[in-house]
Amino acid sequence: MSRFRIGNGYDIHRLVEGRPLILGGIQLEHSLGLDGHSDADVLTHAIMDALLGALSLGDIGHYFPPTDPQWKGADSLKLLAQVNQLIRDRGWTIGNLDSVVVAEQPKLKPHIAAMRDRLAKVLELEPDQIGIKATTNEKLGPTGREEGICAYAVALLVRD
């Protein structure tokens, strides 16, 4: 088996009133938040799917199904810590992560360092092992119409 494995992940959630907006474990000031069974942190969800995909372990819905009441309102960083442990238990470590968050509003650049630091702490990585970029969809599609926010992630795993 190869010493390296890669995986990619994607997530999207609808923006709604009355919910907090949490990205990368950081709560952002915004009039709308992401709707979902857990805290709906699309960045953290995309990262979890990339990590699980790298080892052909399925997706986050398999481990944390939205039909299970125990995950209602769950903190995605706690779920991420469980995924990280699952990977470590199988003899792998994270080489690096890279991600893109697509949102028209709010502007994310001022929050990227805090997101990276929060994720690095949970994953026991150095912040420079985590890339987070933000872009818009130039007013195109559901994210462009500000109906939701999505995130893409890729993970490189290295055999211990």
UniProtKB/Swiss-Prot annotation:
Tell me how the cofactor is bound: Binds 1 divalent metal cation per subunit.
Name the top EC class.
Answer: lyase
Gene3D superfamilies hit by this protein: 2-C-methyl-D-erythritol 2,4-cyclodiphosphate synthase
Which sequence ranges form a coiled-coil region, renumbered to this chain? none
Q: What is its EC number?
A: 4.6.1.12
State one molecular function term (GO).
2-C-methyl-D-erythritol 2,4-cyclodiphosphate synthase activity
Q: Which InterPro entries match?
A: MECDP_synthase, MECDP_synthase_CS, MECDP_synthase_sf
Quote the pathway field.
Answer: Isoprenoid biosynthesis; isopentenyl diphosphate biosynthesis via DXP pathway; isopentenyl diphosphate from 1-deoxy-D-xylulose 5-phosphate: step 4/6
Where along this sequence does the record place binding of 4-CDP-2-C-methyl-D-erythritol 2-phosphate? D11, I12, H13, H37, S38, D59, I60, G61, T135, T136, N137, E138, R145
**Keywords from the UniProt entry:** Isoprene biosynthesis, Lyase, Metal-binding
Q: Which cofactor does this sequence's record say it needs? A: a divalent metal cation
Q: Name one GO biological process term.
A: terpenoid biosynthetic process
Where does the record place the site Transition state stabilizer? H37, T136
* Similarity field: Belongs to the IspF family.
Its annotated function is as follows: Involved in the biosynthesis of isopentenyl diphosphate (IPP) and dimethylallyl diphosphate (DMAPP), two major building blocks of isoprenoid compounds. Catalyzes the conversion of 4-diphosphocytidyl-2-C-methyl-D-erythritol 2-phosphate (CDP-ME2P) to 2-C-methyl-D-erythritol 2,4-cyclodiphosphate (ME-CPP) with a corresponding release of cytidine 5-monophosphate (CMP).
What's the name of the protein?
2-C-methyl-D-erythritol 2,4-cyclodiphosphate synthase
Q: Upper taxonomic classification of the species?
A: Bacteria, Bacillati, Cyanobacteriota, Cyanophyceae, Synechococcales
